Structure formats: structure tokens, C-alpha cells
Amino acid sequence: MKKILSFFMTFLVLAFIVQSCGRDGDSPAVPNDETKDRGHEMPNKIELIMTDLSTNQQHKKVGVLTPNGVVYDDETPFVWKAGGKYHFEIVYFVNDRRINSEFVSKEMAPIHQHFFEMFQGEYQTSENKRKEQAKAMDRVVTYEYQDTDPENKSLKDGASIRLRTWDTNNPTEIDPIGLKGVFSVKTDVETQDYKMLVRLAHFLRKNKLQDNGKVRKYNEIPTIVMVPDIAMTLPIRIEK
């Protein structure tokens, strides 16, 4: 009798396990491979708008993404004057449809940030040399993130600065996405030509913050916790 009861209990346990594993709702979700499925569309056109804040004069470029990189309709450099401030806006399109809103969504804002690295000669790839490159940039120009909410309106049109509402520790601090921002040129600079590598980093982790919870600096892009959604190089001329 005990053997029959033991067999019956074993049968019930096995039946329960099989039934539980067969429920679709209880099956573990298969995580997305974000190197392939980014969770947003990939743009095929970019509009770059540089505005001199002292004159409101604009210099606009349109870039088309090709297998060989971004090809611009205008190869002339953005010109910055010593002591000047320049608002820089990046607008992404898919077949002429604006998609910036996808990068500031509840899911995408925490894991997207633009980085701006200005350099002369060849871009430095080693970590130590890139740190020196960033210091050299800081001696010439600095950048301040100034993304807006909603993203398709300006501050003068009633938009507000976009905040890190997703950051439970600092929900009232600025969200560094980089679709909009301001470059401030130092006053004691010489007339020189530069290149600026702009990359939109897609972070492969919970969010784009450093492990200590601090924001990453605009010209210090990490190399192992992200993939670039976009990378483009722009000519910059600074005039004394």
C-alpha cells in the first residue's frame, strides 16, 4: 500500500511540473540582443543645426547615411568664434520622418547619450591618449547638454529642460542625451582647424550613468558597455 501511495504522489508531482513548464505565461522571457534589436529605428538621414547664440545665424548640414559613412550636402566647416556660444541640434529621420522622440522615450532615454570628441590629426584610440585628447578639447571648448521636453520644441517656445525622471536618486537633474546642447568656446584660443567625432551611444546595461551614479562627461565615451547607434565626423574651424 505504501509503494502504491508513493508511486501515486510521484506521478502527481511530475504532472504538476510538466503542466507548469507548459504554460506560456510562466516561461522566462528571452532577452533582446541589443546589438541587433536596438528597440528603436535606425535613421537614414541626419540634420545638423548650429546656431550662433549672439546673432541667431544658423549653419545647417544634412547628412545621408551610406555604407561608407555619413555623406553631407555641405562639406564646409562649422565656424566658431573665440568667446562664442553655439547651440547645436541633431535631428534624426527615417525616410524624412522625424524620429528623435524614439531616443527620449521612457525605455530609450536612460540608455542613450551623445558624446562629442574634438581633435586634430588622427583620432586617438588608446584610453590614455583619449583622456589627453579630452583635456586638450576642454582647453578650447566645453559642452552643456540642453535637451528639452518635449524634444521637438525649444526653450523659447515653452519647452522645459529634460530631466532624469528615470533616475530614482536624481530625478530632478538634467538628462544628458545630446540631441540639443551648447558649445562654449574659450576666449584665449588660436585660429585652428579641428575634427569632431559625434557618437550616439546605446548602452548595454541598466542605464548610461557611471557605477557611482554620476553622469558621464560629454567627451569621455566608454568603449565596453555600449554600441554606437550613430557615428559621424564634422569639420570645425575656430577663429580667434
Residue ranges with predicted function:
Residues 1-19:
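Sec-dependent bacterial lipoprotein signal peptides
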Residues 16-44:
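Bacterial Sec-dependent N-terminal signal peptides
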Residues 54-81:
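N-terminal edge beta-strand
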Residues 76-95:
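Beta-strand cores of secreted/periplasmic/IMS beta-sandwich domains, seen most often
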Residues 87-92, 164, 169-218:
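Internal, hydrophobic beta-strand segments that form the core of beta-sheet-rich folds
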Residues 104-125:
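Short edge-strand/loop segments of extracellular domains
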Residues 129-181:
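Extended, solvent-exposed segments with strong compositional bias
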Residues 211-240:
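Short beta-strand elements
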